[in-house]
Amino acid sequence: MKKAFILSAAAAVGLFTFGGVQQASAKELSCQPVVTVKTGNTVQNMSLNDAVKKLHINTNIKTLNAANEKEMKQLLQKHAKQSNVKVQDVQKTETAKPAQKTTEKAAADQNTASKAPATAEKTNTTTSAPSSVSAYEKKVVELTNAERQKQGLKPLQIDETLSKSARAKSQDMKDKNYFDHQSPTYGSPFDMMKSFGISYKTAGENIAKGQKTPEEVVKAWMNSEGHRKNILNPNFTHIGVGYVESGSIWTQQFIGK
């Protein structure tokens, strides 16, 4: 049985933030990018095609893919500057990169992939927060479960080992100065979970940078389609949250058992 994997990176807005590649497999890529546009005090989420139309960009690109995404971003940067619209230039592997500042909304970016079942042993789970989980991390779980409750979904249980994995991911992003689901240290989130001895039927990850409080980061995630889908995924049963104060880096890791 194949497993489902969902990734979503929350970045601050007030600019164009480029969405990521949605994967059906490691070799077949299709793009459904979302950008957030700020002109003056107006912030809008729209598709990349709509953003191109908004800036009156003439291009022969009909379908965005991994090969021409760089060209499209360069066009956006050039024309957005002429139109007095901010553009965040990002380097990509699988997902969107962070902006430098935070605002009320985050740009959505969702990746999916199929992968063979993990063979690692299952970890112990608890219904109450372990003592190793910080107050901010507990609050993120509380706010996440409040959003799930609104939709009639079961609350997520805190998994202590998953919490360690999420915290290690946030720390790694700080230490290695990157913002991505793909870690130079641990690989993909799913490889990382496996290295921590975590097994699952389905898994996902949300990351964010710049938000100062649990309320801010959960609000940003909920205002972003990709992140919201992770938070409200009925197949997820357990959660781990990692927060690093220096840099305000946040990671949510989800699994379904």
UniProtKB/Swiss-Prot annotation:
Keywords: Signal
Annotated stretches, region: Disordered: 80-135
UniProt cross-references to InterPro entries, sorted A to Z: CAP_dom, CAP_domain_YkwD-like, CAP_sf
Domain SCP: 141-254
Signal sequence extent: 1-26
The keyword Thylakoid appears for this protein: no
Biased segments, Polar residues type: 121-134
One Pfam assignment: CAP
NCBIfam families: spore_YkwD
Name the record gives this protein: Uncharacterized protein YkwD
